[in-house]
């Protein structure tokens, strides 16, 4: 320790680092330092009976410019002087190396200890500066400023938040199907999950089982299980019509509905042929190819079905187009010309084996389009069973049969071009008689009789 520091602290030379001297009479002098130094002398004598007595009156206090201070504070003042000297020495070295490097493991552990800030304050006179946590509000603002889905597909309108999702999506446009083929049918898929779901259709595996007691149902897809679990959630009566989620109160449901604003989960793309709905237009276009291939294979309705299944006009195409206002009225068919054409085609087929009988009669093609497309693009607003929910106003097969077959005494719904349903009751006797005399009088046409005649003839 620097000698000048001690001299300034005690204002007297110190020999051999001794902080006090002992007199011959037994009195001990203690030295201390403070703002104004003082020297206190305390005398103690020992009585003859062995007890200690302190002569407070004979105690002499030597003070500086200030008053007296108790003697037990002197050691504290000495420690403060030593600490001040350490701070001054460390401050001089802090300009070159404020935070030293540790070469030993125990020092490094102490460096990483929670007492590190206090130790550094005692050594360098200041607390270390650590990085502060970022402001949550500023961080959220930066996240909102960033585009949610910056990776956009160049072939369609879809966008993704991750580049890997975009690369998976591009396989659909490029026709890349790396997963497969299926061991049962040889199909390939763009994603592994699609292949796994497809294999379950062959094996019948249903790994997703309902966990509610008393319900043994199982499903091959997780989405089907989630939709099924809604029927067990009696404590959540508020159900979302766009997905499988349920809620306990109405406000939670109202807060959830805006998440479907992009129509991501809504099946708004409806097939005009069969009434099936899909969430994306590409799925609908892929489904429409089945109807186009079916029409080409049967050679029926080629004058009605568009040649290109991806034609945008296909989505707005009415399968009853070109049939007039009475498209669903069975009396609009000319039964005489239809039976004559059928007989002529049968004769041609019997004379030439290489001839493929394709009935090109317009009325006959329209008839088969009606049978193959039981669901209309313009659904009736009401039926005899009451109102249906939006999106499910489809004509059932039973209603379709009752429309053209008057054998039942129940009401038959006839749908006009405007989409309104007209219910008319037709007795069974009248319908049967009119069907029997249809060839001569052009009455009510029964398509079932024509189908039976076709089955009885061989081409």
From Swiss-Prot:
The keyword Nucleus applies. Expressed in lateral hypodermal seam cells (at protein level). It comes from Caenorhabditis elegans. The gene is lin-29. A zinc finger (C2H2-type) spans 151-173, 180-202, 208-232, 238-260, 269-291. Signal peptide: none annotated. Interacts (via C-terminus) with transcription cofactor mab-10. One of its GO terms (molecular function) is zinc ion binding. It is found in: Nucleus. It comes from the Eukaryota. This is Zinc finger transcription factor lin-29. Residues 1-73, 423-459 are annotated as: Disordered.
